[in-house]
Amino acid sequence: MRCASRSDELVFFVNGRKVMERNVDPEGTLLTFLRKNLRLTGTKYACGRGGCGACTVMVSKHDPVSRKIQRHFSVTACLMPICSLYGAAVTTVEGVGSIKTRLHPVQERIAKSHGTQCGFCTPGMVMSMYTLLRNHPQPSEEQLTEALGGNLCRCTGYRPILESGRTFCMESNSCQQKGTGKCCLDWGENDSSRLGKKNEICTKLFAKEEFQSLDPTQELIFPPELLRMAENPEKRTLTFYGERVTWISPGTLKDLLELKVKHPEAPLVVGNTSLGPAMKSQRQFHPVLLSPARISELSMVTKTSDGLTIGAGCSLAQTQDILAERIAELPEEKTQTYRALLKHLRSLAGQQIRNMASLGGHVISRHCCSDLNPVLAVSNATLNLISAEGTRQIPLNEHFLAGLASADLKPEEILESVHIPHSQKWEFVSAFRQAQCQQNALPHVNAGMRVLLKEGTDSIEDLSIAYGGVGAATISAHRSCQQLLGRRWNELMLDEACRLLLDEVSLPGSAPGGRVEFKRTLVVSFLFKFYLEVLQELKKLVKLFSVAVGADSRHRSEVSDQFLSALEDFPVTIPQGVQTYQNVDPHQPLQDPVGRPIMHLSALKHATGEAMFCDDIPVVDKELFMALVTSSRAHAKIISIDVSKALELPEVVDVITAEDIPGTNGAEGDKLLAVEEVTCVGQIICAVVAETDVQAKRATEKIEITYEDLEPVIFTIKDAIKHNSFLCPEKKLEQGNVEEAFEKVDQTIEGEVHVGGQEHFYMETQRVLVIPKTEDKELDIYVSTQDPAHVQKTVSSTLNIPINRITCHVKRVGGGFGGKVGKPAVFGAIAAVGAIKTGHPIRLVLDREDDMLITGGRHPLFGKYKVGFTNNGRIKALDIECYINGGCTLDDSELVTEFLILKLENAYKIRNLRFRGRACMTNLPSNTAFRGFGFPQGALVTESCITAVAAKCGLPPEKIREKNMYKTVDKTIYKQAFNPETLIRCWNECLDKSSFHSRRMQVEEFNKKNYWKKKGIAIIPMKFSVGFAATSYHQAAALVHIYTDGSVLVTHGGNELGQGIHTKMLQVASRELKIPMSCIHISETSTATVPNTIATAASVGADVNGRAVQNACQILLKRLEPIIKKHPEGTWENWIEAAFEQRISLSATGYFRGYKAFMDWEKGVGDPFPYYVYGAACSEVEIDCLTGAHKKIRTDIIMDACCSLNPAIDIGQIEGSFIQGMGLYTTEELKYSPEGILYSRSPDEYKIPTITDVPEEFNVSLLPSSQTPLTIYSSKGLGESGMFLGSSVFFAIADAVATVRRERDIAEDFMVQSPATPERVRMACADRFTKMIPRDDPETFKPWSIPIA
């Protein structure tokens, strides 16, 4: 029990209101307190590690020294210890503004700029932007990018979020589109010559002139009581007691030092950014925590003639400002070290983490990937230590970094400050890092390098090099540096230095983190970059000083002009761009919203935090919490499950096992709860039910499961093929005579394509609330799902009760992407068993780690192809064999295989084709539906064939694509009629709008002039088939009520996932009923109002549900027609009142029977898809051949939307899916251990695209509309189609790499691997450095990770 009576009182403010609390848990976070205690649910839980920004809030504190409010700073509430907030003012999204009172300009602009989709990340985005504006009312674009760098969004693609933020920036109030001097919003209205006839084409998605202005004087003031507290600080020690942990916050440095003597093992907690995640993931436990937050001496900054001393308590963000200020004050020669540190600080984590983490904590933690320690180590920084016995200094050197006792802190000592000396003339300091992506990512390798040359010469007087990421801690290459003293700074020295470094900084083949050869290459690549930087600086100095240079070229200090670009880092910029769509007919009534860029129905609620998600539902009386216990073995027999220790814990109510299931335990081979055997790490075995979520999770660790390992254990596709381990029969399509065609071609190529898996990373993890009713075994289930009917059916069979006793409710879903089609039924059923057994409501909310471990994702793919073609590039025969890694159960793997094969031809008409596909059964968690449903993987194989043919023929890939594309009306491989006219239009429009051919020449010119940087450009066509391959999956229903006041309630079978389906349904109802959208409301999706629904998936949600809503509205309007004709001058309200009096039903069910679709796999013939979406994308990139990094320069997308229901929403879907696809092909990499354990289980390890990954110029055009009678108002579903267009970035990178390999006479490699990570790009750009690294025999060590595709 907590000792509340002994605890001091915690005093802080939230949204201007005072909070006084004695009963606080020192292990608790601000996020938990806000959500559970204060019911402020706008702050979201998404990752629990500070890596996504969904829980961002603003904290403000007063500085008694400067007598000013310290900069307001954004923090991630999931890491912020609640006890650390004494004397602070917290502002949450609810405190910024509300739709009930007044919207803040930030909230208004992000909503009206269409910067929200699912809305789960939006409160965090708002708070990051709001905090920025509190500090800088007119920020720079660089500050905006920096502020949002720690916030992730999986839906929007970031462009509209940044656009909303840019409206506050001081550079300009418009984008001044790329050198034209004109705002992109003005194109459609003011430049008809560029965009067509007047009123035909538009680019204005929102009315910026209607935004309310920002008035900084109207913000919430800092609480006067906190001012008084800060000016007369509490000097006594504050103590807060919890059940397991005591938090002690001393008021003076003397008290802190005395406490350190008393509790020498107690860690100091400042930002909790290192300790917090470690306590969670590594199960670290500390009974006493010391907080130095109130010790002002630890935040002092001292400027001296020889350097800068920064208090250990200063945050990394404060350190950033301090360094920037010092750089501005001192001559350049003295600030080399400060510049190097500042460079790393800008990319270190996100803004929130930099605001929380302290300099001292960063240094003392000695993380192997520390970005600052390598630079501090080489710059001769010293650590000022203090204890009750006195002070002393120790060098921050290799001995300290290695943790040697003789060079470390004593248990009773603390770090007071860090002294960083000035650099001097002829001294050069640089920092380098390479991570999976540019921002908010831990580095694979980083380095600090410093050289002091003998004045007036290029002779090395002192040299220091340190690396991070290549060992358990930062490694100093002291021995190598000593051997290079006295050497000239030239090529001979460089060769010797590389040899020495590779020998000293050695990585074993089994090194943690893997990527061993890549890391070895970076060790010498970074050195080469440093070598070039110093040479370039010497070139400047030689004008002032006589530098001794030898006559031999090997002794001459020069930098080739071709090498200069290697010295430039890729800039971080806010994307510019134009979004083009067809305007509505000028004769369309203003009240008719169809075709207009209407704001998302819930956008304002997203921005204010008032949108309710599943876990935002208030606590239900007698509610219990559930946590899952999963398998730690990949394939094993369960010998025993001992739950006794878990049940002994306080607040634990029960443990649910398979024996408690009254009905069916899932399907054969796919159990809800494991029985007798487990077939993957992460399989659910049982579940703990407890009074608190914390105790439920702790109890899972007490359950002891005994296993007996079984054979075989299969993880990879190749192993599955070897063991003939498949989930379903082969799917095959064939046309023409493939073997005969191969005999007649000029050339053939065979190749392999490996496509990695992908995590859905929906921002809202899987969650469900099951509430049992008091009679008839009824249940109310609130669940985050794309398919509530499936949840309903699964719970029914699990509990053995009729479906009609179960009602599933879906208000909104925080992202789905296919991951919430089948999986939520599992969690709903397990929670329902717990609810029935205990008689209590059950809430189950998955942690991000468990969600990623359990739920699976996109299927990894291994493809083999053989392609036959003529010398001019005409493909005559193509044979592709694809295998996908389905995991341990069938799930949707058979359907994914079918869709993959059906869509494999993409945009190409090849007369002789053979496509085969198999789904492999492995001992990994089952993979499932994911946006695109096999097409993004399969089409990459097809496009790889195209690029291989182009390389062999010596022709540009776009020429091969054009030559083999569908040209006239024809039939697909499955004999469905197909007219390629719109496909060709998209291709030609993309070529034209992207200025492809002229830019191709510019790319080639750039590549001639640059050796270490290369550009690439690619254009990709797309034919995407929409829908399910079965008629029954296209049906939909709707229920529309008109109430006597004239208001309308619409319910339908679609689920709001962020794709705007509710908004579009209101647009449909508004048009059909001829009333304003404001008169119509959608509350939720419920199986009680619209039964037997189909999953909201396959891009047809708005299509089919729109037709059902249309049908219902037309029925109602037909009933009203006699009244309207009789009283044409009447109002809507008059007509409804009259209808009621005449006993006319004001409720109607609408129904759409669905599109006809079928596929006969025996005959290879079908009409499986109702229609196609066509598109094309052109992307240009620049790669760094020395590090593998890349920058997206420009992307142009042309998409066939036919007649868009809502251009703003549709463009948002295209941009979001494109960026998600880009992530699949570039940065998103799942890593598994040789034991089948998923390493990538948080945003720390798994990198989805961030703000800085958006192309610098990002243009999207909806092709001018055409008519199709098949769909609602001739619209098309665009939810998935943009996904594959992200491959244009992949092929642009491949184009740049191919240029490198041709230039260096390296043979073509027809094995394609996705994603194109920095590791793969760097190693493909083979050079002198990749050749010099040692390589290990794979038979001699156990790798850290294994490839599963």
Swiss-Prot record:
> What's the cofactor?
[2Fe-2S] cluster; FAD; Mo-molybdopterin
| Positions of [2Fe-2S] cluster 2 binding | 118, 121, 153, 155
TM spans, by residue? Answer: none
EC number of this enzyme: 1.2.3.1, 1.17.3.-
This protein's source sits in the domain of life called: Eukaryota
Which part of the chain is the FAD-binding PCMH-type domain? 240-425
- Annotated tissue distribution: Only detected at very few levels in nasal mucosa.
Localization per record: Cytoplasm
What InterPro entries would the database entry show?
Answer: 2Fe-2S-bd (IPR002888), 2Fe-2S-bd_dom_sf (IPR036884), 2Fe-2S_ferredoxin-like_sf (IPR036010), 2Fe-2S_ferredoxin-type (IPR001041), 2Fe2S_fd_BS (IPR006058), Ald_Oxase/Xan_DH_a/b (IPR000674), Ald_Oxase/Xan_DH_a/b_sf (IPR036856), Ald_Oxase/xanthine_DH-like (IPR016208)
Q: Which residues bind [2Fe-2S] cluster 1?
A: 47, 52, 55, 78
Q: Which residues form the active site?
A: 1280
Q: Where does Mo-molybdopterin bind?
A: 117, 155, 816-817, 1098-1101, 1213, 1278
**Cofactor: bound how, per the entry note?**
Binds 2 [2Fe-2S] clusters per subunit.
Catalyses: an aldehyde + O2 + H2O = a carboxylate + H2O2 + H(+)
Q: Write out the GO biological process terms.
A: xenobiotic metabolic process
Q: Which UniProt keywords apply?
A: 2Fe-2S, Cytoplasm, FAD, Flavoprotein, Iron, Iron-sulfur, Metal-binding, Molybdenum, Oxidoreductase
Q: Which Pfam families match?
A: Ald_Xan_dh_C (PF01315), CO_deh_flav_C (PF03450), FAD_binding_5 (PF00941), Fer2 (PF00111), Fer2_2 (PF01799), MoCoBD_1 (PF02738), MoCoBD_2 (PF20256)
The GO terms this record gives for MF are: 2 iron, 2 sulfur cluster binding; aldehyde oxidase activity; FAD binding; flavin adenine dinucleotide binding; iron ion binding; molybdopterin cofactor binding; NAD binding; protein homodimerization activity
| Residue ranges of every copy of the 2Fe-2S ferredoxin-type domain listed in the record | 8-96
Where is FAD annotated to bind?
A: 268-275, 349, 358, 362, 371, 415
- Described function: Oxidase with broad substrate specificity, oxidizing aromatic azaheterocycles, such as phthalazine, as well as aldehydes, such as benzaldehyde and retinal.
Which PANTHER family does this UniProt record tie to the protein? XANTHINE DEHYDROGENASE
Task: State how it assembles.
Answer: Homodimer.
Q: Report the sequence similarity comment from the record.
A: Belongs to the xanthine dehydrogenase family.
The protein's name in its UniProt record: Aldehyde oxidase 2
Which organism is the protein's source? Macaca fascicularis (Crab-eating macaque)
Identify the taxonomic lineage of the organism of origin: Eukaryota, Metazoa, Chordata, Craniata, Vertebrata
